[in-house]
Every structure is written in C-alpha cells, then in structure tokens.
Amino acid sequence: MACGLALLLLAACGASAPPDDAAIVADFRNHQSNVEVTADGAVVRLLPDRTSSTGTHEQFIIKLTSGDITLEVEHNISIAPRVPVALGDHVIVHGEYEWNAEGGLIHFTHHDPKGRHEGGYIQDNGKTYD
C-alpha cells in the first residue's frame, strides 16, 4: 500500500516512475495484461503508423535493456506529439502493458484527455513526450 501511495504521489507531482524491466519480464511469463509498467530499452525496429477508431498510432519495437524480451510500443499521435525515435535510441516508456506471445505491447503512453486512465509517457534523447 505504501509503495502504491508513493507512486501515486510521484505521478501527481509529474515525476517519472523508475524503470522496472524485471516486473515486465514477470508480467510476460505470467501472461499478465492491463498492468502499468515503465520499460527501459533500445529501439530495434520502426513500424508504419496504424490508424484505428481511437486515433493514429506511432509504432516501434524496443528490446528491454535487461533481457531478451521485445515490446511493441503504440503511441497515440492523435493525442500526443510524435516521438522522433530512431533505430538504436535508448527510450524509457511508461504505459499499460498488454501480454502477447511476442513479448507484449505498451500503449496509453500519453496523457488521457478524459482523465480516466493513468497518464503515460515516452522519454527519448532527454525529452519527455506525453
């Protein structure tokens, strides 16, 4: 409970949650979804944008710094600015993890204009995009 309160206070003050790749690896192994995570990794593949009913999503793949797991990142550029990621960039990604057999994906990497979901972000080259 105290950790949850500390994270809530950090989020309320605009501070970022520390990366926890070990938690993501555990979420992957346990087929967990709908979990707020902060990942630390390198961009290994750029994907074309995808448009859905919720907007246009910038997509790329990262490999976690502390393991062999890769994650797809889906960043809604209808809500937040595009992140100018390039292959090899080191990024910190905070959002909601969804399990899949390829490693999983992280979405909600932006603020929620309706205020119903915890805000996420992507840090790239010293700048935060949310």
Where are these regions (language model features)?
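Bacterial N-terminal signal peptides
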Residues: 2-11
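OB-fold and OB-like single-stranded nucleic-acid-recognition modules
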Residues: 13-130
